[in-house]
A protein has these predicted regions:
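ATP-binding Walker
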Residues: 11
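ATP-dependent NMP and nucleoside kinases share a basic, alpha-helical "lid"
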Residues: 98-106, 112-145
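ATP-dependent small-molecule kinase phosphotransfer cores
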Residues: 36-109
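Hydrophobic anchor at the beta1->P-loop junction of P-loop NTPases
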Residues: 3-5
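Small-molecule kinase domains that catalyze NTP-dependent phosphoryl transfer to phosphate-bearing small molecules
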Residues: 99, 106, 127-128, 148, ...
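Walker A/P-loop
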Residues: 14
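Short beta-strand-centered segment that lines the nucleotide-binding/catalytic pocket of NTP-utilizing
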Residues: 26-40
């Protein structure tokens, strides 16, 4: 079984991933794959062709080796749907290809494989998984966690949450919800309940 795990900023999906790993389940992190893919020479060339040299890291100009600044790229495409669509068309095919390769490899040894995907529903990846699981937290909890963790202003956090798909919308699309409005012990119980229900 391949399970897609998603959530929003500050809902605790990475914490759930860590706890699942501690229990011995393999978890593929699509964010890690995307960091690897963005370093592929052909991807760098395609991104520069579309978004210009301003998305490159400055410190690599001496060595002549090009690399993309994720921060600069984010600022370039943020709030521009056309640019986001172009970025996705460049990044998603190699990311999905690598994800499938890792799933295939892990399925040889493991009955269940989890894949952590922040934008699972936004980029319509549901068909890649046997089931989808949402790590859910209410908006107040999301804001509190991100303020504590990232040192951003509340306005910035609100803006990020508003830019993401509504959590209640994600609830409707998910096969299972892991509630995470409480502490670590409560989350452990939620994960245990989920594992028991699935019999994995």
């Amino acid at each position: 079984m391949v399970i897609g795990l998603t959530g929003g900023i500050g809902t605790g999906k990475s914490t759930v991933s860590r706890k699942l790993r501690e229990k011995g389940y393999p978890v593929i992190d699509l964010d890690i794959i995307s960091r690897e893919v963005i370093a592929y020479p052909e991807v760098i060339d395609e991104l520069v062709r579309n978004f210009g040299n301003e998305i490159l890291e400055e410190q690599n100009e001496i060595s002549g080796k090009k690399s993309i600044s994720r921060n600069k790229l984010r600022q370039t495409v943020f709030k521009d749907e056309k640019k986001v669509a172009v970025l996705n068309s460049i990044m998603h095919p190699p990311i999905i290809e690598e994800m499938r390769r890792q799933i295939k490899e892990l399925r040889q040894k493991h009955k269940t494989v989890f894949v952590e995907v922040q934008l699972l529903f936004e980029v319509k990846l549901e068909k890649e998984f046997d089931m989808t699981v949402l790590v859910y937290a209410n908006r107040k909890t999301q804001i509190e966690r991100v303020l504590k963790r990232d040192g951003r202003s509340e306005g910035e956090v609100q803006e990020i949450i508003n830019a993401q798909m509504n959590m209640d919308e994600k609830r409707k699309l998910s096969n299972y919800i892991i509630e995470n409005n409480g502490n670590s012990e409560m989350l452990d119980l939620e994960i245990e309940k989920f594992i028991k229900k699935l019999g994995i």
